[in-house]
Amino acid sequence: MASTRSIELEHFEERDKRPRPGSRRGAPSSSGGSSISGPKGNGLIPSPAHSAHCSFYRTRTLQALSSEKKAKKARFYRNGDRYFKGLVFAISSDRFRSFDALLIELTRSLSDNVNLPQGVRTIYTVDGSRKVTSLDELLEGESYVCASNEPFRKVDYTKNVNPNWSVNIKGGTTRTLAVASAKSEVKESKDFIKPKLVTVIRSGVKPRKAVRILLNKKTAHSFEQVLTDITEAIKLDSGVVKRLCTLDGKQVTCLQDFFGDDDVFIACGPEKYRYAQDDFVLDHSECRVLKSSYSRASAAKYSGSRSPGLSRRSKSPASVKRAGHSSAYSTAKSPVNGTPSSQLSTPKSTKSSSSSPTSPGSFRGLKQISAQGRSSSNVNGGPELDRCMSPEGVNGNRCSESFTLLEKYRIGKVIGDGNFAVVKECMDRSTGKEFALKIIDKAKCCGKEHLIENEVSILRRVKHPNIIMLVEEMETTTELFLVMELVKGGDLFDAITSSTKYTERDGSAMVYNLASALRYLHGLSIVHRDIKPENLLVCEYPDGTKSLKLGDFGLATVVEGPLYTVCGTPTYVAPEIIAETGYGLKVDVWAAGVITYILLCGFPPFRSENNLQEDLFDQILAGKLEFPAPYWDNITDSAKELISQMLQVNVEARCTAGEILSHPWVSDDASQENNMQAEVTGKLKQHFNNALPKQNSTTTGVSVIMNTALDKEGQVFCSKHCRDSSKSSREQTSAREAPPPPESPRPPGPPATSGCDPAGTWRRHRD
């Protein structure tokens, strides 16, 4: 009853009770003996509520009350923000009991770390003529400007709502006619607008915010409007978005640029923008976001500045698709006779290398275009896949003209997207064995087909239990299909960090696997040139044993003479590569020695305290090898002796892969069974970012398969000796003359057998 009366008090006025005519309980008046007539005598309406205490009389009509209760709609702008379209608020006494409550709600909606960081404390009229201090001063349909403590900034806020894309424009004005005319002109030139999802990444320090925006005829009315939408979504620290750049560094200048080949853009503010390499390189987290965004897209494209430094090439999940490139790949398979080093050389960048928190390597940028010529459509039954253009198989296998990939293999989802190749799940229909189908788009390799051909020709020749095998090869006019062995056990670091027990004997077995693969390759006069833990994958067998398999032959080549191309990964690069005096097969032995050192202590033998590449190279050239205590106190002298032989700066004194296999520490199990898993794992995580636990070990194997020779261009680096142009000229002459190789390659040995001799949980394949 009390709540009902409180509501009625808002609409009725309490007055003194007057006696009704004829009422028995009426009291005579005390003034002059005269009596006051009833309510009708005063023209008042009797109260519907008859109480012993009071009566209520209606003073306002229901229409007036309804008008008072109706919310007033007003638009609020940010002070000085000419790109903010304004926010419409419905203001009613029920929603906002006080003016302060409105300020709190406006702060929540309009304030962030860039705009109004101190909150909304003042409201101006749209012309700045006065301040609003109460809810009653807010009028229906008017606009207001919100500010903190700063003075009013004079801006034509009403123009922020661009009439070119407003849906509520009222007709009848000259401005409206002009807008309508402009709309008709724009419609005539908007045939290029097709529905497209683009990703915009804010410039600045990583990790960077990325937003996805759908562009179509309803959302992309003008270039300025799209910029405004991006500004509102991306929220740059420096304010509004002034320019957009593709991952190639090209500035977007018109609406049509959004509908080209590029799908990823970098948003830049009003600050002077420096085109640094880091801004156009996506790190691992950004690539994951983009991969999830475009996993259902019909095509993907990779681009961006090359990574000039020596670094681990972690592959981001995207591929490149260049429109207009339709060069045919030669269907004839020439025998491997070695690719000259001059063919593998690429222009050397002068920019410094970059790194990300998750990986010391750089990433290519990601782009996406339409589905023209996309390999995934072909794999799923397109006409191109129904023809096997090359009758020549791999390792003696033949495929008939009528043979199709889909008849023999069941093709699954995409499990890896690289710069120049896409990797899909692949299962043999007859055996159920899993493989990885690597699809290389020839259009992306235009002008550099010899690099791919060199890599594939080497893969055709090698067949060893410690090397990832090329199972089958097929080809169409637009794509190259490689059925590869799929290794799911992770890389070398994963094998150590994920195990519960890791001993010196396990490390000995790992070195045996690596040396076995190197002896086989060197017997074919093939140098790998990129031996590192990331390219050593763990193969797990049904009986619980494991072995290492070497992959990623993008830098591999046949040694016909001294090589001068400066390439590799800094930690594992041999001194003769840095010195540029010519090198051969034994650069792989040096890298294997560095890996052996890391396997036993968790950190590399040569390292820079300041993380400077020049310091690292100086230490490698000096070759001063130390076994610091206490990390090496429990390691056998036999292991230290082998490492010292593998890390000889003098190439002639350095041991060969065959000598590694015959060393007692490797062949006679002269190693100990002491568990050093915790110590080695701790140092690995301290010195190697890629040694951190991975969510999916299969991803590591897919990344190795996904690499191509074209991805290795970033690992052809400029050493400190390359600054002398005269020496560079001399080296080019020496490379053309091709003097005899520094070491005599052994004749190819017989194919390795599949027998194994268990050593702990690690297999040792005997050649």
Curated annotation (Swiss-Prot):
| All residue ranges annotated as the Protein kinase domain in the record | 409-666
Encoding gene (name): Dclk2
Full protein name: Serine/threonine-protein kinase DCLK2
Q: What is its EC number?
A: 2.7.11.1
| Comp. bias (Low complexity) | 24-43, 301-311, 339-362
Question: Which molecular function terms from Gene Ontology are attached?
Answer: ATP binding; microtubule binding; protein kinase activity; protein serine kinase activity; protein serine/threonine kinase activity
- Oligomeric and partner information: Interacts with MAPK8IP1/JIP-1, MAPK8IP2/JIP-2, MAPK9/JNK2, PPP1R9B/NEURABIN-2 and actin. Binds to and stabilizes microtubules; binding affinity is strongly reduced by autophosphorylation.
- Output compositional bias ranges, type Polar residues: 327-338, 369-380
The record's similarity note reads:
Belongs to the protein kinase superfamily. CAMK Ser/Thr protein kinase family. CaMK subfamily.
Q: Which UniProt keywords apply?
A: ATP-binding, Cytoplasm, Cytoskeleton, Kinase, Nucleotide-binding, Phosphoprotein, Repeat, Serine/threonine-protein kinase, Transferase
Catalysed reaction(s) here are: L-seryl-[protein] + ATP = O-phospho-L-seryl-[protein] + ADP + H(+); L-threonyl-[protein] + ATP = O-phospho-L-threonyl-[protein] + ADP + H(+)
Where does the record place the region Disordered? 1-44, 301-391, 721-767
